[in-house]
């Protein structure tokens, strides 16, 4: 069996990791051993935060809808309940955009929700 020297493979692996660590501070971008740890940790953060991003945006949308609906005299939960009773199906992302950029339309939605709750 011929002898296998791993120089080419090792260099390729090192280059790959150091390329991923480009832009990191200090030894994290220059030293392979430290760069491996930094890239691994960055990957863990990226994986975790891709999931947290969805939760955080939903929280933001709810906060915006709540603030806008309270300005019109209705709490968030009662507003959403009123929309469901009025069979208005608009998701929270669009509701938040309407609340921020088109206050007149949002006010009419609140009125429709109030009417549905009164019935």
Swiss-Prot record:
GO cellular component, one term: ribonucleoprotein complex
GO MF annotation list: rRNA binding; structural constituent of ribosome
Disulphide-bonded residues: none
Protein name, per record: Large ribosomal subunit protein bL20
Domain of life: Bacteria
Keyword annotations from UniProtKB, A to Z: Ribonucleoprotein, Ribosomal protein, RNA-binding, rRNA-binding
Biological processes, Gene Ontology terms: ribosomal large subunit assembly; translation
Family membership: Belongs to the bacterial ribosomal protein bL20 family.
InterPro entries: Ribosomal_bL20, RIBOSOMAL_L20_CS, Ribosomal_protein_bL20_C
């Amino acid at each position: 069996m011929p002898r296998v020297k791993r120089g080419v493979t090792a260099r390729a692996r090192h280059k790959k990791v150091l390329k991923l660590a480009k832009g990191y501070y200090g030894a994290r971008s220059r030293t392979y051993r430290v760069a491996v740890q930094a890239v691994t940790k960055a990957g863990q953060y990226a994986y975790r935060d891709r999931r947290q991003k969805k939760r955080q945006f939903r929280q933001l949308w709810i906060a915006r809808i709540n603030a806008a609906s309270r300005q019109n005299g209705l709490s968030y939960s009662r507003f959403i309940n009123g929309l469901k009773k009025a069979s208005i199906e608009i998701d929270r992302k669009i509701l938040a955009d309407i609340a921020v950029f088109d206050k007149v339309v949002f006010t009419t939605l609140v009125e429709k929700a109030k009417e549905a709750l009164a019935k």
